[in-house]
Amino acid sequence: MPTLKFSHSILEYMQNKNGIKYNSEEWVEKMPSIGCVVEENDNEGIEIEIFPDRTDLLSHETIARAARSFLNSVEYSPDFEVSEGNIDMTVDPTIEKIRPVILGAVVRGVDNGNSSKEKDDFIQSLMEHQEKLHLTLGRKRKFASIGVHDLSKLKPPFNVISVDKNHSFIPLAEGKEMSIKEILKSHPKGKEYAHVMENMNKYPV
């Protein structure tokens, strides 16, 4: 079961935005009833062990929403408008055996805060949520992986193709191009997940 550390300041911000007063002691006492066992509650945050069947509670946003519903009887009915987009993503047939299912979506109207700190906290929380989904539902990216990108910095249409190990690009947090072979040997994330692609001779990009 994953154990996560949630920041008091982020949880307080989220609850205040929804008219709820955040009380970490109340969480310690009552949240175990919905599969959230509190391991530690210190000055910085609250550490919670999430039950395996509650993968919907792996982020600040989702656990704060669950607490509003459970502790404060706030009704929540998601109302998302979903429509067909006009951005094309072409998947090369050679990808079928590597990644048989590929999905994409554009999410708009997300409130990521006003101040620089709020925006930074939002991005950090989003990345942590992504990694926890990789670890749990994605089985360390063996079954599934997620990519989150800033659409304003990308130019559609998008093409998903397969390449060999000599293909080069600039990986995350690097300032120079690296080949896939180099990434799998020396980049932190590449080394961490190299085992997922150890039997591949083609790689999806």
Give the role of each language-model region:
Residues 1-205:
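RNA/tRNA-interacting regions in translation and RNA-turnover enzymes
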